[in-house]
């Protein structure tokens, strides 16, 4: 259970970081 929760947290962190990077690249393109 704990390993599944930590794996889900890691996956969520990777998804958020990818989304932030994507938004950051789009903002750089707009400038």
UniProtKB/Swiss-Prot annotation:
Keywords: Chloroplast, Electron transport, Membrane, Photosynthesis, Plastid, Thylakoid, Transmembrane, Transmembrane helix, Transport. The keyword Transferase does not apply. One of its GO terms (biological process) is photosynthesis. Signal peptide: none annotated. It is found in: Plastid, Chloroplast thylakoid membrane. It holds the Pfam family PetL. The 4 large subunits of the cytochrome b6-f complex are cytochrome b6, subunit IV (17 kDa polypeptide, PetD), cytochrome f and the Rieske protein, while the 4 small subunits are PetG, PetL, PetM and PetN. The complex functions as a dimer. Component of the cytochrome b6-f complex, which mediates electron transfer between photosystem II (PSII) and photosystem I (PSI), cyclic electron flow around PSI, and state transitions. PetL is important for photoautotrophic growth as well as for electron transfer efficiency and stability of the cytochrome b6-f complex. HAMAP family: Cytb6_f_PetL. This is Cytochrome b6-f complex subunit 6. It comes from Psilotum nudum (Whisk fern).
